[in-house]
């Protein structure tokens, strides 16, 4: 979790405008001491932005003092008040304090009615959670820290509706993952805005953290794109390799999401593959741990044993050795 201190801006501005000459006996001429590489005047960070400038959802839930420790709920579970109460009791009995809830699920449905102006949200909403405001009030009563899970680029629903926003096979059909799942294209700004707009709606009803999952290209790109056809949008003309373009697209999306969500006072988190933290970049899927970490508050690294291949950690089959992994 990133925490940021306050800065004395006046002194910083003064120093930033001065080039300070430093005299040394061995050097006969003045040397300019560079005090700072980056400009002092930048967009305000959420952590130092006065609260009065942040959107007020009306839901007051403090960030847990001892850190976030919680459980995951599907939209169907979250829609059941009796089950939610049972799970709140479970949290209270086990030193837990948070719930992650599917708000845009793995198929592509938005799971509650936000009355949003976004056309994709309107079209793809199935309001399984019929009263999101009542749920948020219940969380407020118990101080349960609510996290909205938003599946970003795995979206079979939108891919079927808008094939041009997905990846196409040479015969014009939509490329499918082995289990039939479809992805939308992270190169396209429209896919960014869809995920971010769902996040904004979640923040407005009271969620305190927006967690983006499937923030990546499909794994087919880990080897090659198998002759797929897809639009690179504004990344097409960049003087970068296809690998570099994928990494930039994912890193830029994360930065964009955090910027857009900043006025709503929420933490921004992402789920990434565990191995992405052990390599300089997972270039096939576009995940660069360092670049992503610069633009989020939280990273959930997926270290499941099944995500590691033969030979990782000197194990022939890591999935068979969960404790060693």
Task: Show the residue positions of the predicted features.
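Catalytic domains of carbohydrate-active enzymes, especially glycoside hydrolases
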Residues: 84-109, 204-209, 298
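Active-site-adjacent "subsite" loops/lids of carbohydrate-active enzymes
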Residues: 59-78, 153-204
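The substrate-binding groove and active-site-proximal loops of carbohydrate-active enzymes
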Residues: 69-78, 116-129, 179-193, 239-248, ...
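Active-site-proximal loop/short-helix segments
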Residues: 115, 156, 161-164, 208-243
């Amino acid at each position: 979790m990133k925490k940021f201190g306050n800065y004395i801006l006046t002194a910083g501005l003064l120093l930033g405008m001065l080039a300070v000459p430093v005299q040394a006996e061995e050097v006969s001429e003045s040397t300019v001491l560079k005090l700072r590489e980056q400009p002092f005047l930048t967009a305000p960070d959420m952590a130092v932005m006065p609260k009065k400038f942040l959107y007020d959802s009306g839901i007051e839930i403090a960030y847990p003092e001892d850190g976030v420790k919680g459980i995951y709920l599907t939209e169907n579970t979250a829609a059941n008040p009796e089950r939610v109460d049972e799970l709140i009791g479970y949290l209270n009995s086990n030193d837990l304090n948070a719930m992650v809830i599917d708000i845009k699920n793995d198929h592509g449905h938005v799971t509650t009615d936000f009355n949003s102006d976004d056309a994709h949200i309107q079209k793809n909403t199935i309001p399984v959670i019929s009263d999101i405001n009542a749920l948020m009030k219940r969380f407020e009563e118990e101080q349960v820290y609510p996290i909205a899970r938003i599946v970003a680029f795995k979206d079979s629903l939108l891919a079927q509706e808008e094939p041009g926003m997905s990846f196409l096979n040479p015969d014009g059909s939509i490329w499918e993952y082995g289990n039939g799942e479809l992805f939308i294209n992270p190169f396209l700004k429209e896919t960014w805005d869809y995920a971010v707009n769902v996040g904004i709606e979640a923040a407005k009803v009271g969620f305190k953290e927006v967690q983006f999952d499937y923030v990546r290209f499909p794994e087919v790109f880990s080897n090659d794109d198998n002759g797929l056809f897809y639009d690179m949008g504004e990344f097409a003309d960049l003087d970068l390799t296809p690998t570099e373009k994928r990494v930039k697209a994912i890193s830029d999306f994360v930065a964009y999401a955090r910027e857009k969500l900043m006025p709503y006072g929420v933490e921004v988190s992402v789920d990434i593959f565990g191995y992405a933290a052990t390599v300089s970049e997972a270039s096939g899927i576009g995940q660069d741990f360092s670049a992503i970490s610069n633009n989020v508050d939280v990273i959930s690294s997926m270290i499941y044993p099944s995500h590691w291949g033969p030979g990782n950690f000197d194990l022939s089959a890591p999935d068979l050795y969960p404790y060693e992994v």
